[in-house]
């Protein structure tokens, strides 16, 4: 008798699914906030899934984590205090702590079970969460940002998709609170979904940020397991422009995706993406 195959499908739009073969269900839980699963896949290794959406995989996580962390941290000349909103898997913290000038990196995560599961089953990604420079705070990111003023050099919003607990992280009043939470020369980056499937969201977020921050930039990266593969990030900066940095300093850290030549290329947008944010 043939062995039964198990497949996982993420419904990425109402009309499109992303499907991969599962060799093992490592862990599942219903947390206070979401359904959590860690699956072993044939193609992408271990995969973290929240509410049916792929968050990260062992094979392609470096693409996302390097792009969301290093672009802002190399844009700011001296990022000593950094906060990550969301990102309970710990991948962004791992990348942040490659920067020696960072004195403290705070992980602000609403769902403690995501952190615990990542520490137990995804050590390759969560390995820096016990670093002495990292501090984990279990609270709502919106609440944390609105209660702290003039505190951080860089804030990274590593949110889930704009459903469930993350909805408020894509709204204008949140970006205003981020502005106030940053120091006078601070900057922030948020993941802002796919230019193929989320054009209205990208447009709205870009213009919300642009109305608050003097410098607003959109950049793109490739993450194979994310909807369409093409992914956007939006930066709001009070002072520093990512297009004007000395990219030679990027060589000092160990990366697999991001490099000096790529930095400026990330901001070269296809015409259809330029039109989204006009």
Curated annotation (Swiss-Prot):
Signal peptide: none annotated. Its main location: cytoplasm. Keywords: Cytoplasm, Polyamine biosynthesis, Spermidine biosynthesis, Transferase. InterPro entries: PABS, PABS_CS, SAM-dependent_MTases_sf, Spermi_synthase, Spermidine_synt_N, Spermidine_synt_N_sf. The keyword Cell inner membrane does not apply. S-methyl-5'-thioadenosine binds at residues 34, 109, 140-141, 165. GO terms for molecular function: spermidine synthase activity. GO terms for cellular component: cytosol. GO terms for biological process: spermidine biosynthetic process. Pfam families: Spermine_synt_N (PF17284), Spermine_synth (PF01564). It is found in: Cytoplasm. Homodimer or homotetramer. This is Polyamine aminopropyltransferase.
